[in-house]
């Protein structure tokens, strides 16, 4: 406890002790941000404002200094519990209403007893030293990334999404640096210290703390204008061909803003929209109002990008822009509902990109984007509901995953079909108007949408949103009828209401049948319009609008493969690819048959979305069910050298690179890398050559050091050079060096740039190192709680995926089993992350 500049310490200590007892009894100041504390503050605190100052030295070895003036109103005398995840020595001083007062730094909070606060307006001033973790400091720049509960690591605050506040910011930075934040720059002054500038920013609109943001550093700025609106793009790129993409990026931001303004009927609700494109950024993007962050990996495309890469960038921009309305303007009340912002961002992103790509089958693209990713977690023993319980924001990052990002848009599309497009739009507009600059819940949205339909949306939501998993759906022809049955594989007796479409083919007869699975029935029967004669081929979910495991047998799969090869219906083929792959993963069809059929299908597929799906599924099959690589190498190299579509050649080359094992294949790749001469009509990028260098260093240990040194000398961009220097030791031919890299990754400070750390861990656990790297599994799993505590929201999943994805051995499975046996009470949400990524071992 700090009792600076206070008279009567003995009397005071008694008062504070008494107050502390009251606080402990209330159970409010536990570590993290508990739900009880959040509700308490929301009930008693209001009109919160932050006036923040940070002095940022040029060297990241020097500490940043911060000050915050926090003003608020209290409706009665209550303890003031301010979130700050720091140590006692990081808090330099605290004053309340202009006077020094006693305070306590404990359990990740600064606590001021109720004796010292006033009813009505209070003003707290705190001088502090922020932790570097969420400041993401590099040598020449830094950026804040505070979602979901990391604002409290950077400054003292009320770090909960429903305490929306106004922020004013001042930064003191080196004069050669640029700075950008949520608000526009109002003033830039030089300071009394040479080479330093003081930059002041305009007060923001009401924001949740996780949306507060600033970026400072050596950045290049571009400006673009359309219809009276300006957008600044900040970046660190040095490649002129990549910088030349900035106008196209700005155009897509403008397009997304205009689309949402038209759909919602609400003009862009914030003062500005700036884009900051950063190397090594942890996510695809982050929707900070006025200062939206993007990763350079997805924004600056290679010279000859694939359709997938172009769609990915457009979808990312549309996703983050949609968040301005869904997440920023209207924000979830608590992070158990974080999916309500992600569902809208992804659902609307799929619609916003449609007019940008008129030649793309967007129904197919929707299926391809969301359903496989959702199944990848929903089929596992680590599956979770879309909406999950959350009692403390310290665990909020574990709520994130493919279920909330990818299953939720599929469910939202079902909801739109139930409501109808016009009613859905009316309901969304009412939702945004009702909760403008405020907070909402899924239940609140459902109450609004219920006005526009006679369907029981609450009952529908209970199964699709509040329960985990998916139905197992089978179909057969019996006595001239199509019989479709659903089963809850988890034995809960759940019934998922949904509309499906089947096609039954018997010889020359064919019929398309709508199937309605009701919430009160496990089966559906319909008489066929023709008399079945012999074996029938039953095609499930032909429009891809259903969700579940559409179970087939090995014998039934031959009919699906035949239709896949012969059909011209792109959506049907996409749905069949998913069905066949899911049956591979559920082990109802054989890997050998899957490989052979896929290799026969791929050379003849001209649709780029279907080709990339099939190639990805083939790659997964080869990874999970290893086999002799030589015939596969030959088949893939034939695609690389003969396919008429250049991007198909490039995608096939990347899979060829990952599976190459034979001496001939490795030597071919080495010559290609050494001479920098790509196969005809298969243009390779710098990142392709970097990936080749890692792969060749592992295959050719006697040449590894020279390969790495040569590749490093070829890289010109300073940020990419630093990335390569960090990752390349993970492919060392010397086990002692690799062990040293692994040991270093167990230290939080060495995981600061999370994409680099993930890549290094993946290299350490490459399939070529599988026997040696089994030893890494237990210690890396033991580190998961610390990885979660010190990492950002997607990092625990990235960590365990990098650790386990290349392992297929019995020994690896035994390591995972032994870990769970040793930790029977391991946190459920963290356990699920492991189980999701380990499912292929079982």
Predicted region positions:
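Bacterial Sec-dependent N-terminal signal peptides
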Residues: 1-29
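Hydrophobic alpha-helical and helix-loop surface patches within well-folded domains
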Residues: 2, 22-23, 68, 91, ...
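N-terminal, polar/Ser/Thr-rich
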Residues: 18-65, 92, 136-141, 159-161, ...
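Extended, low-hydrophobicity, Ser/Thr/Pro/Gly-biased non-transmembrane segments
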Residues: 32, 125-223, 461, 546-550, ...
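Ligand-binding face of N-terminal immunoglobulin V-set domains in extracellular IgSF glycoproteins
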Residues: 65-86
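A surface-exposed beta-strand-loop module
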Residues: 85-142, 194, 521-534
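Short coil-to-beta strand junction motifs in C2/discoidin
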Residues: 85-90, 163, 493-500
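Non-catalytic accessory/interaction domains
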Residues: 170-173, 237, 322, 386-389, ...
């Amino acid at each position: 406890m700090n009792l600076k500049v206070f008279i009567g310490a003995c009397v005071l200590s008694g008062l504070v002790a008494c107050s502390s007892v009251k606080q402990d009894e209330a159970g409010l100041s536990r570590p993290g941000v508990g739900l009880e504390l959040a509700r308490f503050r929301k009930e008693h605190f209001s009109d919160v404002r932050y006036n923040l100052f940070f002095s940022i030295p040029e060297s990241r070895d020097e500490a940043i200094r911060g000050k915050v003036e926090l003003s608020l109103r209290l409706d009665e005398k209550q303890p003031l519990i301010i979130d700050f995840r720091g140590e006692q020595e990081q808090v330099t001083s605290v004053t309340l209403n202009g006077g020094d007062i006693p305070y306590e730094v404990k359990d990740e909070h600064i606590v001021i007893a109720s004796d010292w606060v006033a009813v009505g307006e209070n003003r707290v001033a705190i001088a502090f030293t922020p932790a570097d973790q969420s400041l993401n400091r590099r040598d020449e720049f830094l950026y804040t990334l505070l979602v979901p509960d990391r604002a409290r690591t950077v400054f003292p605050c009320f770090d909960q999404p429903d305490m929306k506040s106004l922020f004013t910011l001042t930064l003191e930075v080196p004069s050669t640096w640029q700075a950008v934040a949520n608000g526009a720059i109002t003033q830039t002054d030089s300071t009394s210290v040479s080479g330093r500038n003081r930059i002041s920013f305009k007060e923001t609109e009401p924001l949740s703390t996780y949306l507060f943001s600033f970026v400072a550093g050596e950045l290049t700025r571009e400006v673009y204008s359309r219809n009276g609106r300006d957008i600044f793009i900040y970046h660190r790129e040095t490649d002129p061909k990549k910088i030349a993409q900035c106008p196209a990026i700005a155009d897509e931001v403008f397009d997304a803003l205009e689309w949402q303004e038209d759909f919602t009927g609400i003009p862009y609700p914030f003062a500005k929209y700036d884009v900051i494109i950063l190397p090594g950024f942890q996510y695809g993007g982050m929707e900070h109002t006025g200062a939206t962050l993007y990763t350079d990996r997805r924004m600056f495309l290679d010279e000859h990008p694939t359709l997938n890469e172009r769609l990915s960038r457009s979808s990312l921009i549309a996703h983050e822009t949609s968040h301005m309305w869904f997440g920023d303007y209207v924000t979830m009340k608590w992070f158990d509902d974080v999916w309500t912002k992600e569902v809208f961002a992804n659902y609307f992103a799929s619609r916003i990109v449609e007019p940008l790509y008129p030649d793309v089958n967007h129904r197919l693209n929707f299926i391809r984007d969301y359903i496989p990713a959702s199944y990848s977690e929903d089929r596992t023993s680590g599956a979770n509901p879309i909406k999950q319980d959350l009692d403390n924001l310290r665990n909020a990052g574990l709520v994130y995953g493919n279920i909330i990002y990818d299953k939720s848009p599929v469910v939202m599309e079902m909801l739109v079909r139930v409501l109808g497009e016009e009613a859905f739009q009316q309901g969304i507009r009412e939702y945004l108007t009702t909760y403008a600059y405020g907070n909402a819940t899924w239940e609140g949205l459902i109450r609004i949408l219920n006005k526009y339909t006679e369907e029981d949306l609450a009952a529908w939501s209970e199964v699709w949103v509040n329960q985990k998993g998916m139905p197992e759906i089978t179909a057969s022809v019996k006595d001239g009828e199509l019989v479709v049955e659903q089963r809850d594989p988890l034995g809960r007796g759940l019934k998922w209401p949904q509309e499906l479409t089947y096609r039954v083919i018997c010889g020359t007869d064919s019929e398309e049948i709508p199937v309605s699975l009701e919430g009160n029935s496990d089966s559906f029967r319909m008489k066929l319009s023709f008399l079945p004669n012999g074996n029938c081929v039953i095609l499930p979910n032909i429009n891809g609008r259903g969700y579940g495991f559409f179970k087939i047998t090995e014998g039934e799969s031959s009919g699906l493969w035949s239709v896949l090869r012969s059909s011209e219906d792109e959506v049907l083929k996409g749905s069949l690819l998913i069905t066949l792959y899911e049956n591979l993963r559920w082990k109802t069809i054989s890997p050998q048959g899957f490989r052979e059929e896929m290799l026969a299908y791929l050379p003849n597929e001209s649709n780029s979305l279907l080709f990339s799906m099939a190639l990805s599924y083939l790659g997964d099959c080869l990874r999970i069910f290893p086999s002799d690589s030589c015939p596969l190498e030959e088949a893939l190299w034939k695609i690389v050298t003969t396919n008429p579509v250049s991007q198909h050649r490039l995608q096939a080359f990347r899979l060829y690179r990952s599976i190459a094992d034979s001496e001939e294949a490795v030597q071919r790749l080495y010559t290609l890398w050494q001479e920098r001469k790509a196969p005809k009509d298969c243009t390779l990028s710098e990142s392709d050559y970097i990936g080749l260098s890692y792969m060749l260093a592992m295959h050719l240990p006697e040449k590894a050091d020279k390969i790495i040194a040569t590749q490093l000398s070829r890289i010109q961009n300073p940020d990419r050079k630093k990335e390569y220097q960090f990752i390349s030791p993970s492919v060392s031919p010397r086990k002692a060096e690799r062990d040293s890299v692994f040991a270093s990754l167990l230290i939080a400070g060495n995981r600061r740039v999370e994409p680099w750390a993930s890549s290094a861990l993946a290299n350490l656990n490459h399939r070529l190192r599988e026997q040696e790297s089994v030893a890494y599994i237990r210690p890396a799993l033991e580190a998961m709680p610390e990885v979660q505590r010190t990492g950002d929201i997607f990092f625990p999943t990235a960590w365990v995926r990098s650790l386990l994805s290349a392992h297929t051995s019995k020994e690896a499975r035994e390591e995972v089993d032994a870990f769970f046996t040793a930790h029977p009470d391991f946190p459920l949400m963290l356990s699920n992350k492991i189980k999701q990524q380990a499912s292929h071992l079982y």
